[in-house]
From Swiss-Prot:
Disulfide bonds join C37-C60, C40-C62, C45-C63, C51-C66, C74-C90, C84-C109. Residues 469-498, 505-532, 539-564, 567-592 form the Antistasin-like domain. This is Cysteine-rich motor neuron 1 protein. The lineage of its organism: Eukaryota, Metazoa, Chordata, Craniata, Vertebrata. The keyword Transferase does not apply. One of its GO terms (biological process) is negative regulation of osteoblast differentiation. The gene is Crim1.
């Protein structure tokens, strides 16, 4: 054995007698100072037999060996000569020359000199060979060991098998059972769900079912004057568990002479249920029942490993076709090919003696074996192996002897492989065995079957702490300035210098050990990568005198032909489902192809302006660093991420992070981020590719590539410290008054603010530097406010893009509670009328109905008015007026016809209108007449005079301001402000039609149309005196 730095091991297992003999000879001939033990593999240990005494563990602590007896050798280097039995000790005689005793001398086992008090209570164990069996992992494991106590439960194997058979009869083997996936049905209100369970002796559970709940049957109470009449008897089936009663008047229609047509019993498919019985208008006959789809029945199938679900037929929501029908099909995974052999995903193969590869997604990921260091003068590399092993020098002998090992005779000098890690050599009749020296440079090495040394698949730098580099100060270079990256110092930190191409290429190949016979692959900078080029196809040399700047075309075999390429390579990182567009020369460009009109419904081709200021084409996908985003009909739809709520009052979203955090929080919170064509929404519902829905009142989502992407309202800046949040608003709002500019400011000279990045903002303009911070320009100074987040009660709050505070999605997902009445479905809180006297209301699944009570009338002969519930006296009835069109002139002098809509008075209206409606007074209770108010003439005068006064004031103000060359508001519609450029001592203005206007100190003017920047959420004026000024930009005159 030899010293191996960092090695894991040799010996102690396997053919112990041969190995120990070889080890003794090796240690005797060489100056060994370390013992290398392999990882313990007890399956290769041989049970010591016919031991005269007890057994002890070997030198490596893995296998057992016979203990040394009296007068037998013991000890030696690392105890390779064995340990003495109980009651004996290993005695080493001192050297005759007077040298000191080392740890490598061989001793002899002798009786221990025990004192009488030491022998008290010492009783040697009487070890015997005991055979038996135990049940381990569902199998009978039998064996024979030498021990003092019997560790076996069954003395014979037949007894163990009988016990195992009894266990198997009581509990079936469900490892290979294939159970049908069944979804729990949605039970009607009169029944409860009984979950399925596996009966004794079976593996698959019974299907869940609905059973009638007697407690769900409620007794119906009728109003005075009505009787509770049984309409249909309960059948005992879910949906028909309760007797159906209806309230009918005491003096109802006589049904004795009515002959009802026969009603056939409806047989509903398994995915639907039969609705309740309905009556005709007279209440004598029953109408045919209908079938409606069960809610919550549709689900997504779960396929076994190696197969994926595929839609066979799509459901349309009708009984029998309520849900989509799926089937599980085998998925075809990409394979890797090496030496004409196919390897599938996860398979590992050997590329050469030192390189191993694993197939991952059709790509071979290769890595190199890790060999340890050898401290020996002579070594060799066994045939077919990568790592070398040590060998002893072979001296010439006259009559060398052979070796007998593993049933074979080996000649002097022969080498052979004992196992994956042990290599032996025959030297003069004795086998000398050594182990391969393995190195380890990673945390989790992978064991390759048939190989000794494990290999490292992960990079080794994970065990090295990254350098603590500070920010690069006093450097004007940006990321875009250094195409090949920044230069690094000796600590691995950036310097204010750009790399050149040669330095970048050298770094990519510096640690590469691959020997590629056909060269290396190159990247976009034409630098060689540590990846081998595939074997080139056998192509004839091209005899062509053409000069092709873009290269030659290739045929179907990949060989060059004498035709020039007309298009350059397309370096594009976009993901386009329908491919790329072509330019006028027929070459591909980095733009996604639009959907043809015949492929489906028309899709808007508008572009998306993301919150980071980039434009994206319709149906384009990208990743903004935190979320997957998608441009859908001009809207930026991004995935919801899960973020914890910050505990401080002024959180912020730092550069390079996705979730809000506190200033003293150094732990970076990473957001938690399928099968294509199916999306599983947070509310538990499934949606297909391209389907759009509202997850709450503020968030619209769409299904794209198996991901739920959502678009939310962009909230304006919050110019207060503690905004309030209401349920009817998607954005938090400020209840305090916004900051006002000082009155002493000279309004003749417009003020503006400039931030650290050089952006210019107009006076009273507000913006959001990030999702948690809002700023405003007041008196040429920037004031910023930080939004604080309230605590939430859910475990996984989500964060919308562009917003600061996470919130609980469970609180916003409405519960779809509906009411079923007379064969119709009504939403929660929906009202409807059965007739003029009966009004119903849906409240949390309960149908509540009210009947109008008619008051007594003083007249003798009341009349019945059509559309009214209660009769009325003739003197109280007012006929409905005729709607005669009235001619009115609008502000342009044109004649408009206006048809007045007069209300119909009724004593039975549930919702009473206010008594004062503009210049008309409505009083139903007094005389049921409409009277013009006394102020009608005054309102007419005001409506004419006030606009004239306002117009004159505006004209006079305009003339006065024009003389002083002041700033005046433009009467234009509000729009998102444009981002001004960085200016020096210039006055900035915004024109509603022409864009950004700049006035220099001189008479010259510059005009430029500015691109909108999504970071600036709009112009929010602070001037409360003029409402027109609050929504307008300013222009110099």
């Amino acid at each position: 054995m030899y010293l191996v730095a960092g090695g894991r091991g040799l010996a102690g297992c396997g053919h112990l007698s041969v190995s120990l003999l070889g080890l003794l000879l090796l240690l005797a001939r060489s100056g060994t100072r370390a013992l290398v033990c392999l990882p313990c593999d007890e399956s290769k240990c041989e049970e010591p037999r016919s031991c005269p005494g007890s057994i002890v563990q070997g030198v490596c602590g893995c296998c057992y060996m016979c203990a040394r007896q009296r007068n037998e050798s013991c000890g030696g280097a690392y105890g390779l000569h064995g340990a003495c039995d109980r009651g004996l000790r290993c005695v080493i005689r001192p050297p005759l020359n007077g040298d000191s005793i080392t740890e490598y001398e061989v001793g002899v086992c002798e009786d221990e000199d025990w004192d009488d008090d030491q022998l008290i209570g010492f009783e040697p164990c009487n070890e015997n060979l005991i055979s038996g069996c135990n049940i381990i992992n569902g199998k009978c494991e039998c064996g024979t060991i030498r021990t003092c106590n019997n560790p076996f439960e069954f003395p014979r194997k037949d007894m163990c098998l009988s016990a195992l058979k009894r266990i198997e009869e009581e509990k079936p083997d469900c490892s290979k059972a294939r159970c049908e996936v069944r979804f729990s049905p949605r039970c009607p209100e009169d029944s409860i769900l009984i979950e399925g369970y596996a009966p004794p002796g079976e593996c698959c559970p019974l299907p869940s079912r609905c059973v009638c709940d007697p407690a769900g049957c409620l007794r119906k109470v009728c109003q005075p004057g009505y009787l509770n009449i049984l309409v249909s008897k309960a059948s005992g089936k879910p949906g028909e568990c309760c007797d159906l009663y209806e309230c009918k008047p005491v003096f109802s229609v006589d049904c004795s002479t009515v002959e009802c047509p026969p009603v056939q019993q409806a047989v509903c498919p398994l995915d639907s249920y039969e609705t309740q019985v309905r009556l005709t208008a007279d209440g004598c006959c029953t109408l045919p029942a209908r079938c409606e789809c069960l809610s919550g029945l549709c689900g997504f199938p779960v396929c076994e490993v190696g197969s994926t679900p595929r839609i066979v037929s799509r459901g349309d929501g009708t009984p029998g076709k309520c849900c989509d029908v799926f089937e599980c099909v085998n998925e075809t995974k990409p394979a890797c090919v090496f030496n004409s052999v196919e390897y599938y995903d996860g398979d590992m193969f050997r590329m050469d003696n030192c390189r191993f590869c694993r197939c991952q997604g059709g790509v071979s990921i290769c890595f190199t074996a890790q060999c340890g260091e050898l401290n020996c003068e002579r070594y060799y590399v066994p045939e077919g192996e990568c790592c070398p092993v040590c060998e002893d020098p072979i001296y010439p002998l006259n009559n060398p002897a052979g070796c007998y090992a593993n049933g074979q005779i080996r000649a002097h000098g022969d080498r052979w492989r004992e196992d994956d890690c042990t290599f032996c050599q025959c030297i003069n009749g004795e086998p000398h065995c050594v182990a391969t020296a393995c190195g380890q440079s990673c945390m989790h090495p992978v064991k390759v079957p048939g190989e000794c040394c494990p290999v490292c698949e992960e990079p080794t730098y994970i065990t090295i702490d990254p350098p603590a580099c500070g920010e690069l100060s006093n450097c004007s270079l940006k990321e875009k300035d250094c195409v090949y990256g920044f230069k690094l110092d000796h600590n691995g930190c950036r310097t204010c210098q750009c790399k050149i191409r040669e330095e970048l290429c050298l770094g990519l190949k510096r640690a590469c050990t691959l020997d590629c016979p056909f060269g290396f692959l190159t990247d976009v900078h034409n630098c060689e990568l540590c990846q081998c080029r595939p074997r080139p196809k056998k192509c004839r040399p091209t005899m062509c005198d053409k000069f092709c700047p873009l290269g030659f075309l290739k045929n179907k075999h990949g060989c060059d032909i004498c035709r020039c390429k007309k298009c350059p390579e397309l370096p594009c990182s976009k993901i386009c489902p329908l491919g790329f567009q072509q330019d006028s020369h027929g070459c591909l460009i980095c733009k996604c192809r639009e959907v043809p009109p015949s492929a489906g419904p028309p899709v808007l081709s508008g572009t998306c302006l993301s919150m980071d200021g980039h434009h994206h084409k319709n149906e384009e996908s990208w990743h903004d660093g935190c979320r997957e985003c998608y441009c859908h009909n001009g809207k930026e739809m991004c995935a919801l991420i899960t973020c914890p709520v910050p505990a401080c009052g002024n959180p912020t979203i730092r550069s390079g992070q996705c979730c809000p955090s506190c200033t003293d929080d150094f732990v970076v919170q990473k957001p938690e981020l399928s099968t294509p064509s199916i999306c599983h929404a947070p509310g538990g519902e499934y949606f297909v590719e391209g389907e759009t829905w509202n997850i709450d009142s503020c968030t619209q989502c769409t299904c794209h590539s198996g991901r739920v992407l959502c678009e939310t309202e962009v909230c304006p800046p919050l110019l207060c410290q503690n905004p309030s949040r209401t349920q009817d608003s998607c954005c938090p709002q400020c209840t305090d008054d916004p900051p006002q500019p000082s009155t002493s400011h000279n309004e003749s000279v417009p003020s503006y603010c400039r931030n650290d990045e050089g952006d210019i903002f107009l006076a009273a303009e507000s913006w959001k530097p990030d999702a948690c911070t809002s700023c405003v320009c007041v008196d040429s100074a920037i004031s910023c406010y930080s939004e604080s987040c309230p605590s939430v009660a859910c475990e996984r709050p989500v964060l919308r893009k562009g917003q600061c505070c996470p919130y609980c999605l469970e609180d916003t997902i409405p519960k779809k509670v509906v009411c079923h009445f007379s064969g119709k479905t009504y939403a929660d809180e929906e009202r409807w009328d059965i007739d003029s006297c009966t009004h119903c209301y849906c409240l949390q699944g309960q149908t509540l109905c009210s009947t109008v009570s008619c008051p007594p009338l003083p007249c003798a002969e009341p009349i019945k008015v059509e559309g009214s519930c209660c009769p009325m006296c003739p003197e109280m009835y007012v006929p409905e007026p005729t709607n005669v069109p009235i001619e009115k002139k609008n502000h342009r002098g044109e004649i408009d016809l206006e048809v007045p809509m007069w209300p119909t008075p009724s004593e039975n209206d549930i919702i009473h209108l206010p008594r004062d409606m503009g210049h008309l007074q409505v009083d139903y209770r007094d005389n049921n007449r409409l009277h013009p108010g006394e102020d009608s003439s005054l309102d007419s005068i005001v409506s004419v005079v006030v606009p004239i006064i306002i117009c004159l004031s505006i004209i006079i103000a305009f003339l006065l301001i024009n003389q002083k060359k002041q700033w005046v508001p433009l009467l234009c519609w509000y729009r998102t402000p444009t981002k001004p450029s960085s200016l020096n001592n210039q006055l900035v203005s915004v024109d509603c039609k022409k864009g950004t206007r700049v006035q220099v100190d001189g008479p010259q003017r510059m005009l430029r149309i500015a691109e909108p920047d999504a970071r600036f959420s709009g112009f929010y004026s602070m001037q409360k005196q003029n409402h027109l000024q609050a929504d307008n930009f300013y222009q110099t005159v």
